[in-house]
Amino acid sequence: MKFLLVVLGFIGFLKDGITVGGESMLRGVYQDKFYQGTYPQNKNDNWLARATLIGKGGWSNFKFLFLSPGGELYGVLNDKIYKGTPPTHDNDNWMGRAKKIGNGGWNQFQFLFFDPNGYLYAVSKDKLYKASPPQSDTDNWIARATEIGSGGWSGFKFLFFHPNGYLYAVHGQQFYKALPPVSNQDNWLARATKIGQGGWDTFKFLFFSSVGTLFGVQGGKFYEDYPPSYAHDNWLARAKLIGNGGWDDFRFLFF
């Protein structure tokens, strides 16, 4: 059963308790430039041709580039971390106005991402950490972060949150979900639900929109649909194709 949902300017549908559809601003880095626009609606929608250029160059040099739940842009460049409101036009010098909130050591992380409540998660040296994000360049984040995973976390290809607070992950060829670990004694993978049987390691990008729609890039093509819920749910077979080719060429792609 589907119900129309209108919340904070988003319009979508509830299907089996999961919001699908809705308007979100897609951001991407392509050939060193930064773009934004509403996400493509079908395979003939040339997103790059209609997207707004919001950064002229240098964006491919970032190791991480992602948004907080509050809409601030975070970036790791040259081992340092910065934050600021996202750029809105191509003459907006984001690095010139962004606040440096970490002086060094940020290249050590394999994953860096937010949960829906604004906590920052990171994987370093096979371990998973969680803490509120740094506020200044003297804030030693890793020293105060809580270790919530004691090993095995470098083996994941994707780690990211659904807006409902569940952690989603790709390990090997398989896709999993569960509430995040709360301590380093919590064997997350052992208790997680398998929601994808194989082939998930072939995706280049895999991420949620703010309303819980799953987006993925595989084989240069861009897909969207509500996320799988059980191991034999063939997501790629039922997902909507919204990009015919070239999506593998993006350096970053996110909401």
UniProtKB/Swiss-Prot annotation:
Signal peptide: 1-19
Domain of life according to the entry: Eukaryota
Any single GO CC term annotated in Swiss-Prot or TrEMBL for this entry: extracellular region
Pfam families found in the cross-reference section: Tachylectin (PF14517)
One MF annotation (Gene Ontology) recorded for this entry: carbohydrate binding
Predominant location category: secreted
One of the GO BP terms on file: innate immune response
SUPFAM superfamilies: Tachylectin-2
Subcellular location per the Swiss-Prot or TrEMBL entry: Secreted; Cytoplasmic granule
Keywords: Immunity, Innate immunity, Lectin, Repeat, Secreted, Signal, WD repeat
Repeat positions for WD: 20-67, 68-114, 115-161, 162-208, 209-255
Signal as UniProt keyword: yes
Function: Lectin that binds specifically to N-acetylglucosamine and N-acetylgalactosamine. Is part of the innate immunity host defense system of the horseshoe crab.
Assembly: Monomer.
UniProt protein name: Tachylectin-2
